Regions:
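Active-site C-terminal subdomain of aminotransferase-like
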Residues: 1, 8-118, 131
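Active-site cofactor/substrate anionic-group-binding motifs, chiefly glycine-
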Residues: 3-4, 151
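Short glycine/serine/proline-enriched coil/turn segments at secondary-structure junctions
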Residues: 5, 40, 155-157
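Conserved PLP-binding catalytic core of the aspartate aminotransferase-like
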Residues: 94-103, 108-144, 152-154, 158-159, ...
Length: 197
């Protein structure tokens, strides 16, 4: 049984936003896909998709599904509209991936250590929970920049990181400003540019 978490991929990968498995032609090898309306689609709520029998089994036996409240019709209508829109529009996907590439280039130019990969999510390695929380707090309080800190138990101790995500809505100036602010904070707090990776 192959269960694939595509919450960060639906809407952003593939010709029609169908996710990584669909983009790579592997969807026929996946039994169940988990997605969310809370990221690329801009709403809330999650979903699973798969073979009818599998989805029916979840619907009938999964307590997390049985004892939850359904999404409101207005949210579902918005989700449907968003899915339909992103099936045909490539503007947002193209811009999001271009912005992710610019973010990585800007971080590289300043000497920051992040986990390299093809994803639009850029894990900026910090390696210390207190430092990670301090940086994200300062970014929000003093610079109006929200960055998600990722600490234990989500990741092992010593591998704490900031999860950076450049969206389609960000401009090149936004991205450069963020990296400049980050560089300033590292200098101000005497942090090494090459934190533990």
């Amino acid at each position: 049984f192959t269960y694939l978490d595509e919450v960060h991929a639906v809407g952003l990968y593939g010709d029609n936003g169908g996710g990584v498995a669909r983009a790579r032609g592997l969807l026929n090898r996946i039994d169940m896909v988990e997605g969310t309306f809370g990221k690329a689609y801009g709403l809330m709520g999650g979903f699973i998709t798969g073979r009818r029998e599998t989805v029916d089994a979840v619907r009938s036996f999964a307590s997390g599904f049985i004892f939850t409240t359904s999404l409101p019709p207005a949210v579902l209508a918005g989700a449907l509209a968003s899915v339909e829109y992103l099936k045909t529009s490539t503007i947002e996907r193209t811009r999001a991936h271009a912005n992710a590439a610019l973010l990585k280039q800007s971080l590289d130019a300043q000497g920051f250590s992040y986990l390299k990969g093809e994803s639009h999510i850029v894990p900026l390695m910090i390696g210390d929970a207190k430092c990670c929380k301090m940086l994200t707090d300062i970014l929000l309080q003093d610079h109006d920049i929200y960055v998600q800190p990722i600490n234990y138990p989500t990741v092992p101790r010593g591998t704490e990181r900031m999860r950076l995500t450049a969206t389609a809505a960000h401009t090149a100036d936004d991205i450069r400003h963020f990296v400049n602010v980050l560089s300033f904070l590292y200098e101000q707090h005497h942090l090494p540019m090459q934190m533990r990776a």
